[in-house]
């Protein structure tokens, strides 16, 4: 991977005689070439350039002296030694072995998960005791004094928990248990049955209701302040012995009254809102004839069985009854808190397996799920179900991001539905409270912006602010879900947004954060077994460790290649085989891309070697000789090269002959000429930079970018590696990712700019004159350095948005090739997140990323 170091060949102005550096008098002087030998010197004398080492990593100070006898000598340039020595790698890989039975278990899990996806219908979820109690209230439509759905009443009688409550036994949430228990004891009392259960429920209520005061407001279920006080009033009329004067009960009643006072009467009937979800708590104020006009197509009121049951008992509406029969046909003797959940289930299931890094096993299933979602996509947004009339930002943002990345035509304008006049984003129309999970999903969505999508930039700014504040407020977690580690998810998303979140690192992180027993909060607590389950997690762990073991074998082979090529003798360059291999392993990690990873790593290593050679080590004459040797592919020129350059060329010649032969087998045609041409263009860019340095020439910003986007060498790595992505690449396809393509140019541009923003200060301190920042300041001498840096960041961010569009829309290029280009751009954003992550990898987070990706198995 071409992660360019600071250029050292341009540190002394032509014509300079001396550079006095008394502060570094005790440092060692190391000779360096000076191309214009007689420039600015007295007749018969030559200038010699020296480099002195100062304090800190790779800190170099230049000085010039006159020497009438000696010719200029080559630089002895040193870098921090490589961290990943063989003994370090061996110490991390020897303790973990992948069991032979794991592969069979992986196959079994893949088959079981495929069946889960294929069986997706309207959404699978757990019983809601609260909603079942409301459905059980309905009297028989034939006029008999029996329940219309006796099986639901029986379910209540049979499903009381040992502590006297109703709800999910594995997770105690006081809000949820108290609400469900109150609903059940009222229903049993109305039907004059289950006296023992009622008494046990009352005792639970008395002893546990006070615990609500200790729970965070964010754990209060949706509509609790509407339905709970209404049911308490009903319980009081029924004569149930409950602690009606508890402080928290008074507070909830006050919240209800305040909310209803803020509610304009006309809005309840003007358009569908979340109030339709809680109509059972608004019975004293609802005009039932008006409310029927807002009924969903499926007969429900916002997919809520409880709300729909309340409307039916008031109106006798046949569509309400049809909906309730439809739900009970699915679940038998109980109902969930809302149904259907078809869009929610599919989107979150796809998102889950993608984040866990196992999506490659389920391509057909993902396509089927997304085709289904897209068929119900609405430009005003979507909700959790296909016929839900109230869109929410959570499902909409998740859908926008995933559908866009999978090539579906969706517009970011859909987010405008959820923005208020103050520029803030909300989950539902008319709602002011937000949750961490929905804002997290909007934030993730905002990073897949296209050029000119200001709504995405606004969403990014708004949600980043909200999420950073939420990290400081424990009570902010969370309104819509009780997740294993939502805080960890937020921290990861803010630190590693889309453009520097590599698939393998995200999988590693999400495996740790993912909760197979996570629950969501609607009107009651509910689970989604096709979203949160042990099978996803087990497969993710087994698959991660299996792939990691393959990567370790590949890395050992590549390290042997480095040694056998004689590159350990090259003291002027960086040995970073492991860090470079980490790059393709972090995104093209699948077993079938083993050759692609090897070619990517070898090519990238040569871009580093030759960058260091052209940047600071070889004379212009030697560099011209090397370039000619590559152009002519002529071994006879090797004898004229210095020893270290011979090693470079022989390794280069042998390696790319081997790569070309393998490419011929893969592509069915000779590719050596193609590879040589790719390298000729690369070496021309290196040579131009060397010439600029020798002449102390500072190009314009545009001139600099034109060359630097090539010299960054990402294009060279990608164009050669693309031959090994498993696709037969025609000339037409190659042209779409070739040097002239906008896709490749954007990759090089963003890579160059992120490099410069993090290294220009250090390079300037070493005497470097050309960087994006410095060249822009030359064009605009009136601006400050801070303004120039801001401009460079703006150019880069706009280019990343354009890169998103190229990645998504460039469908004439095979998926694997698109990934190769796009992910190479993203890995640069990661490597240069905090500085020079290649040269100083041992001092940056890259060291931990390498360890987690390649060596540390997941438990």
Swiss-Prot record:
Record: residues binding Mg(2+) 2: 611, 615
Domain of life, source organism: Eukaryota
Binding-site positions, Mg(2+) 3: 755, 759, 763
Residues annotated to bind substrate: 259, 479
Disulfide bonds: none
Signal peptide: none
Protein's pathway: Terpene metabolism; oleoresin biosynthesis
GO molecular function terms attached to this record: copalyl diphosphate synthase activity; levopimaradiene synthase activity; magnesium ion binding; terpene synthase activity
GO cellular component: chloroplast
Manner of cofactor binding, per the entry note: Binds 3 Mg(2+) ions per subunit.
Keyword Chloroplast included in the entry's annotation: yes
Intervals of motif DXDD motif: 392-395
Transit peptide: 1-70
Coiled coil: none
Cofactor: Mg(2+)
Binding site for Mg(2+) 4: 392, 394
PANTHER family per UniProt: (E,E)-GERANYLLINALOOL SYNTHASE, ENT-COPALYL DIPHOSPHATE SYNTHASE, CHLOROPLASTIC
Stated role: Involved in defensive oleoresin formation in conifers in response to insect attack or other injury. Involved in diterpene (C20) olefins biosynthesis. Bifunctional enzyme that catalyzes two sequential cyclizations of geranylgeranyl diphosphate (GGPP) to levopimaradiene. Levopimaradiene is the major products of the enzyme followed by abietadiene, neoabietadiene and palustradiene.
Name this polypeptide is given: Bifunctional levopimaradiene synthase, chloroplastic
Lineage summary: Eukaryota, Viridiplantae, Streptophyta, Embryophyta, Tracheophyta
